Amino acid sequence: MQYRPALSKMKPYVPGEQPPPGKFIKLNTNENPYPPPAPVVSAIQSAATGPLNRYPDPMATSFRRAAANALGLPGPEWVLAGNGSDEILTLLVRGFVGEGESLRLPYPSYILYRTLADIQGANWEQVPFNDPWELPQSFGENREDLKLVLLPNPNSPSGTIVSKPQIAELSNSLNCPLVVDEAYADFAEENCLDLVQSDENIFVTRTLSKSYGLAGIRFGFLVAQPHVIAELTKIKDSYNCDAISIAAATAAMGCQEWLADVVAKMNVTRDRTTDRLRALGFDVTPSHANFVWCRHPEGKHAEIHQYLKQSQILIRYMDFPDWGDGLRISVGTDDQIDACMLMIERAMQSLNISLPARADST
């Protein structure tokens, strides 16, 4: 059997572990630890008893209208709905980057970007962050074969951000579209939605998997100028969003007060997590997302991860060649974070990692 050469050469993207529900404290894939709001649950229940023998709205019109209203956009023609923001990213790579052409991404960041380029038979260029997590000037350099630049903002695994003025300047320096992946933007102090309206080369991708607590339904969207949306609509699957997810996502857009409350609560827990890790001697990168990236001067990150896993707590161990490794810990409930911190301290004791004299696990 003969596959496309690009497929034979590529390595698959490996997502975070998804254990059976209830067996682990799960702090490894940046999900919202709180359930979605009641109106979303009601919308799902109502849609589940609706005419599921019929195809859904191929354009997810109700969601696009609700999103435009919630986000202050001129109209639904500025929004394209997708089966998770990963599908939106797939459409962008498919629409702009041909075989043998290139896309650019920062490093370390979301590894799926490389996979999407590989699927296309395209090239990808990784530009390493300067220490500490700052984009180098070379990230904005043009090249004839460069067709798309992807920038997660906030970034994963670091949780760091590039400011809006920097992004506007970056777009001005490029001759190709700049995709700002705002999967975690609700946890940050600013976003780039207004830049989309003034710059046709800036696109913003969003997901409902993080702040909205809807990772299980798979729904994301693109915000771009209407002519971009119209062109990308040509290459999307005919019915890419199902009726239940459209209903849930539409209802979620009407829950902005709930969103603000849950984000504020998670940000308090995030900052508390940062303080606890620093008290244990970890170097923690200031985060604008729903996770923290930490490294210990004595290392042993893989061993800490394994100790916690054996104790039924999942965090994410990540090792980036030529950059180093570390631990990414999702923001959970306060009780989940308390359990995680206690087990990290026990892991450090077991692994003979130095503990500060006044480290406190309470």
Swiss-Prot record:
This is Histidinol-phosphate aminotransferase. Homodimer. One of its GO terms (biological process) is L-histidine biosynthetic process. It catalyses: L-histidinol phosphate + 2-oxoglutarate = 3-(imidazol-4-yl)-2-oxopropyl phosphate + L-glutamate. It comes from the Bacteria. The keyword tRNA processing does not apply. The keyword Methyltransferase does not apply. InterPro entries: Aminotrans_II_pyridoxalP_BS, Aminotransferase_I/II_large, HisP_aminotrans, PyrdxlP-dep_Trfase, PyrdxlP-dep_Trfase_major, PyrdxlP-dep_Trfase_small. Coiled coil: none annotated. Signal peptide: none annotated. Pfam families: Aminotran_1_2. HAMAP family: HisC_aminotrans_2. Keywords: Amino-acid biosynthesis, Aminotransferase, Histidine biosynthesis, Pyridoxal phosphate, Transferase. It is an enzyme of class 2 (transferase). Its EC number is 2.6.1.9. PROSITE patterns: AA_TRANSFER_CLASS_2. One of its GO terms (molecular function) is pyridoxal phosphate binding. Belongs to the class-II pyridoxal-phosphate-dependent aminotransferase family. Histidinol-phosphate aminotransferase subfamily. The modification N6-(pyridoxal phosphate)lysine is found at K210. It comes from Rhodopirellula baltica (strain DSM 10527 / NCIMB 13988 / SH1). Pathway: Amino-acid biosynthesis; L-histidine biosynthesis; L-histidine from 5-phospho-alpha-D-ribose 1-diphosphate: step 7/9. Its cofactor is pyridoxal 5'-phosphate.
